[in-house]
Regions:
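Polar/charged, compositionally biased leader and regulatory segments
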Residues: 1-35, 145-203
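Short glycine/threonine/proline-enriched tight-turn/helix- or strand-capping micro-motif at secondary-structure
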Residues: 12-15, 29-58
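A structural micro-motif recognizing beta-strand termini
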Residues: 22, 35, 49-53, 61, ...
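A residue-level detector for short acidic-glycine micro-motifs
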Residues: 34, 50, 66, 91-94, ...
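Short polar/acidic secondary-structure junctions
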Residues: 37-39, 53-55, 69-70, 102, ...
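Short, well-structured beta-strand-loop connectors
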Residues: 55-66, 97-112
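Zn2+-dependent peptidoglycan hydrolase active-site motif and core
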Residues: 58-96, 126
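Conserved, short, structured surface segments that act as functional micro-motifs
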Residues: 81, 101-158, 162-163, 170
């Protein structure tokens, strides 16, 4: 969601306040086969594997901002959530939702595949704020496949972002829930080259 920091210095992700019914591990039962930050290209997400055509689920309530075939991502779904968070699901065999659809946490949105640049059937999962990817392990405990109950703060630093844990008891938030309608863009782009506030994506 580029442009968030033109309105706020700190984007707060209050994970501790999200009810159990409003989050879902994106690929239940899956195993992480490639971690975030792997390799010289800095892996922009994590790769999770179960079996071909397994059900991929939306991590949180949100609105689908992209659902199409896109370069090395293959079939990809981008979901925009409250608080400026976006999640990305790619290499899908088939997308089950369309751009503009409202989705609930745990709702099936795609089936695992190996479209795009992928050597095996799996889910490439990313978390982003302001168009910048960060480690999904901050959001989810990958071993337990549960939500990390903490309060996260995202701030701008140069062309990137800094993501850090905030105290449980924190002064009055600099922002509350972002209405998703506040950030309407005609297009959503997962740039594969360095432009403005985007980092190069290496799958």
């Amino acid at each position: 969601t580029p442009g968030l920091f033109s309105q706020r210095e700190l984007i707060e992700l209050p994970l501790e306040d999200i009810p159990d019914t409003e989050y879902s591990f994106p690929l239940p039962g899956g195993k992480v086969i490639s971690p975030y930050g792997r390799g010289r290209g800095r892996h922009s997400g994590i790769d999770i594997k179960t079996y071909a055509k397994d059900t991929i689920r939306s991590a949180f309530n949100g609105v689908v901002r992209m659902s199409k075939s896109y370069s090395a991502y293959g079939n990809v779904v981008v979901v925009r959530h409250d608080f400026g968070l976006e999640t990305i699901y790619s290499h899908n065999f088939k997308n089950l939702v369309h751009c503009g659809d409202t989705v609930k946490a745990g709702q099936p949105i795609a089936l695992t595949g190996r479209t795009g640049r992928a050597s095996t059937e799996h889910l490439h999962f990313e978390t982003r704020v302001n168009g910048q990817h960060f480690d999904p392990n901050i959001i989810f405990n990958m071993k337990e496949q549960t939500l990390n109950r903490q309060r996260i703060g995202c701030s701008k630093k140069g062309n990137g972002i800094v993501v850090q844990q905030l105290p449980t008891i924190y002064p009055k938030p600099l922002q509350k829930k972002y209405p998703m309608e506040l950030f309407k863009y005609p297009n959503v782009s997962l740039h594969l080259q360095n432009v403005s506030l985007k980092e190069r994506i290496e799958l």
